[in-house]
UniProtKB/Swiss-Prot annotation:
Catalyzes the methylthiolation of an aspartic acid residue of ribosomal protein uS12. It is an enzyme of class 2 (transferase). Keywords: 4Fe-4S, Cytoplasm, Iron, Iron-sulfur, Metal-binding, S-adenosyl-L-methionine, Transferase. CDD domains: Radical_SAM. Belongs to the methylthiotransferase family. RimO subfamily. PROSITE patterns: MTTASE_N (PS51449), MTTASE_RADICAL (PS01278), RADICAL_SAM (PS51918), TRAM (PS50926). [4Fe-4S] cluster 1 binds at C15, C51, C80. NCBIfam families: 30S ribosomal protein S12 methylthiotransferase RimO, MiaB/RimO family radical SAM methylthiotransferase. This is Ribosomal protein uS12 methylthiotransferase RimO. Residues 376-440 form the TRAM domain. GO terms for molecular function: 4 iron, 4 sulfur cluster binding; aspartic acid methylthiotransferase activity; metal ion binding; protein methylthiotransferase activity.
């Protein structure tokens, strides 16, 4: 009978959705008595959760797999890159098993094959917290409400990796949120591939939470989450009419006044080639309406420059749209062909690399001026911030306008706080990304 504690190393790459997948696998392994260790040398086997969205992410995943093989030798691969098993085995033929995303049971079974769980383990020692194993700091957590996507954007292969939209029952989502809040989480980050489509696949089926009926729909989900007394932040939202319904909740202080909306472009021609919603004029009107209802609303977005067929006229249209939209937080990527994406077969003229680089630089300079002006306008305001880190020089916090890892920070010249504290500050300075505040 084996009494030694089996040990697993874990490498998690990619987006927040992949982080949640990793957390679920780790939680199951911990429940079975496995110890999660931080080094290759101490592990009996290493699991690598990969990203396969763009070429640079694939290269990073292959490098991580190679490092794990070199340092440990026993490696199981999962995640989005796992849907193309040959592309992994061609480079690393010695991997023990390959699975795709969301295949939690197959990953755990593969671990069993390499190092079986203890025949007996003490549940008091191997106790897993009610909220499960989390890879984020204790005070915030990702809350995944669905898998997959019903869109067919020509630059994207996510539906081929993660499938069509499958919403989680709202009762399950809210019960998980409750467990997280009881465990000390101060901020819930709602994630999916398309948050505004939540429940469409289930025809907004009625479910139950705490004995009360709740529809599986974005508005009802947000209303219930807003009753939990923590920050609730919405990510991956499409600018559909039903988003209008949640803006009053933000204006009333029940949800963070923050929307993460991946617009990708503004030129109607480019949006059509991307197979994205091409209603940029209606989108501007919608943004204006949202801000009339909720003046504090922060909008973050991502864009692609250099998409095949993009002309200088299209790009200038995008810059003019940014001036009109006055977005707060913006990321920009140069288009990179993705293997298997429909955009490869559109027959459009590729944009030369030097032109893509030049447009990216112009885009960033243009948006930085907008972002800087919007942050400068906050100097002198008082606001609540959530502390993420504290060191000998001070604290790093975030306001309602700042999602972790992707947005800016609020720096506080004080060590009299600790991570997870919500404190009030007065903003005294700002640049294009960050702000500086004093405790009030």
């Amino acid at each position: 009978m084996s009494t030694a504690t089996p040990k697993v190393g874990f490498v998690s790459l990619g987006c927040p959705k992949a982080t949640v997948d990793s957390e679920r696998i780790l939680t199951q392994l911990r429940m079975e008595g496995y110890e999660i260790v931080p080094t290759y040398q101490d592990a009996d086997v290493v699991v690598v959760n990969t990203c396969g969205f763009i070429d640079s992410a694939k290269a990073e995943s292959l490098d991580a797999i190679g490092e794990a093989i070199a340092e440990n030798g026993k490696v199981i691969v999962t995640g989005c890159m796992g849907v193309a098993e040959d592309s992994i085995r061609d480079v690393h033929p010695s991997v023990l098993a390959v699975t795709g995303p969301q295949q939690y049971e197959q990953v755990v079974s593969a671990v069993h094959e390499v190092v079986p769980p203890k025949t007996e383990h003490n549940p008091l020692i191997d106790l897993v917290p009610p909220q499960g194993i989390k890879l984020t700091p204790r005070h915030y957590a990702y809350l995944k409400i669905s898998e997959g996507c019903n869109h067919s954007c020509s630059f994207c292969i996510i539906p081929s990796m993660r499938g069509k939209l499958v919403s989680r029952p709202v009762g399950d989502v809210l019960s998980e949120a409750e467990r997280l809040v009881k465990a000390g989480v101060k901020e819930l980050l709602v994630i999916s591939q398309d948050t505004s489509a939540y429940g469409v696949d289930m025809k907004y089926k009625l479910d139950f939470w705490n004995g009360q009926p709740v529809k599986t729909r974005m508005l009802e989900l947000c209303e219930a989450l807003s009753s939990m007394g923590v920050w609730v932040r919405l990510h991956y939202v499409y600018p559909y009419p039903n988003v209008d319904d949640v803006i009053p909740l933000m204006a009333a202080g029940k949800l963070l006044p923050y929307l993460d909306i991946p617009f990708q472009h503004a030129s109607p021609k480019v949006l059509k080639s991307m197979k994205r919603p091409a209603f940029e004029d209606k989108t501007l009107a919608r943004i204006k309406k949202w801000r009339e209802i909720c003046p504090e609303l922060t909008i973050r977005s991502t864009f692609i420059v250099g998409f095949p067929g993009e002309t200088e006229e299209d790009f200038q249209y995008l810059l003019d749209w940014l001036t009109e939209a006055q977005l707060d937080r913006v990321g920009c990527f140069q288009y990179s062909p993705v293997e298997g994406a429909p955009a490869n077969d559109l027959g459009l003229e590729p944009v030369p690399d030097d032109v893509k680089q030049e447009r990216w630089e112009r885009f960033m300079a243009h948006q930085q001026a907008i972002s800087s002006a919007r942050l400068q306008a906050k100097i002198g305001l008082e606001m609540d911030v959530l502390v993420d880190e504290v060191d000998g020089e001070g604290a790093v916090a975030r306001s309602w306008a700042d999602a972790p890892e992707i947005d800016g920070s609020v720096f506080i010249d004080s060590t009299a706080v600790k991570p997870g504290d919500k404190v009030r500050v007065r903003i005294v300075d700002a640049d294009e990304y960050d702000m500086w505040g004093e405790l009030v």
